[in-house]
Structure formats: structure tokens, C-alpha cells
């Protein structure tokens, strides 16, 4: 039986407070989960809703990762900040990928570093 997980990918080039970082990760987790198939979402929930937070150096890397995930058929959510506190409105902060089968997500994220 396959395991399911979700990855949230952040940008190293943005310097966010811990609170802002946590909120952006939460937005990505929820938004990406809303795009998952009902079956994958249920299996992920049954397995404990495994999440991993990873990082990429730049926004360019984030967009490239989103495209890789799209080619694998993975649900994604690119999060843009509202600009009310620390960073300008529209700043792309994080990418949520999954939930989906771990082996499919790993094809896209295996070379990334943990936060």
C-alpha cells in the first residue's frame, strides 16, 4: 500500500518572520489539499496527513518545481501574499504539492533540502 504525503516548498530568498512563514505554509497546505482527488485526500488523512517543508533558492526554482509537479499530475497551489504586513502584495511565497502518493511527489522533490 502506498503512503501519501504533502510537500510545502518555501523560498530561501525571502526573509520572513517565523509567524509569516508559518501562515504561508498553512495557506499552501490547505490550498493544495483542496486540489487533490477525493481518494488521495482521504488516504492522506487516514495516514496521518504527513507534511514535509522544503526549500528552494529562488522564485524561478519555485516556478520550475510547479511545472514539474504539473507534468506528474500532482495538485499544486502557489501562494501569493496579500501584502498587509511584511512583504509587497502579490509576492509569491510558497508552493504546496499534494497530497498524493509519496513516490510520485518524490520524483519532483527528492533533491530539495529540508527547511
From Swiss-Prot:
It holds the Pfam family PTH2. The lineage of its organism: Archaea, Methanobacteriati, Methanobacteriota, Stenosarchaea group, Methanomicrobia. SUPFAM superfamilies: Peptidyl-tRNA hydrolase II. Its main location: cytoplasm. Its EC number is 3.1.1.29. Keywords: Cytoplasm, Hydrolase. InterPro entries: Pep_tRNA_hydro_II_dom_sf (IPR023476), Pept_tRNA_hydro_arch (IPR034759), PTH2 (IPR002833). One of its GO terms (cellular component) is cytosol. One of its GO terms (molecular function) is peptidyl-tRNA hydrolase activity. The natural substrate for this enzyme may be peptidyl-tRNAs which drop off the ribosome during protein synthesis. Belongs to the PTH2 family. It is found in: Cytoplasm. It catalyses: an N-acyl-L-alpha-aminoacyl-tRNA + H2O = an N-acyl-L-amino acid + a tRNA + H(+). The gene is pth. This is Peptidyl-tRNA hydrolase. Gene3D superfamilies: Bit1.
Amino acid at each position: 500500500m502506498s503512503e501519501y504525503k504533502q510537500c510545502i516548498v518555501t523560498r530561501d530568498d525571502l526573509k520572513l518572520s517565523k509567524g509569516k512563514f508559518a501562515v504561508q505554509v498553512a495557506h499552501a497546505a490547505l490550498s493544495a489539499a483542496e486540489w487533490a482527488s477525493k481518494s488521495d485526500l482521504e488516504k492522506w488523512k487516514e495516514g496521518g496527513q504527513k507534511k514535509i517543508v522544503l526549500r528552494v533558492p529562488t522564485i524561478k526554482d519555485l516556478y520550475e518545481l510547479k511545472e514539474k509537479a504539473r507534468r506528474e499530475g500532482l495538485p499544486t497551489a502557489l501562494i501569493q501574499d496579500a501584502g498587509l504586513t511584511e512583504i509587497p502584495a502579490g509576492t509569491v511565497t510558497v508552493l504546496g504539492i499534494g497530497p498524493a502518493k509519496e513516490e510520485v511527489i518524490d520524483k519532483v522533490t527528492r533533491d530539495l533540502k529540508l527547511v
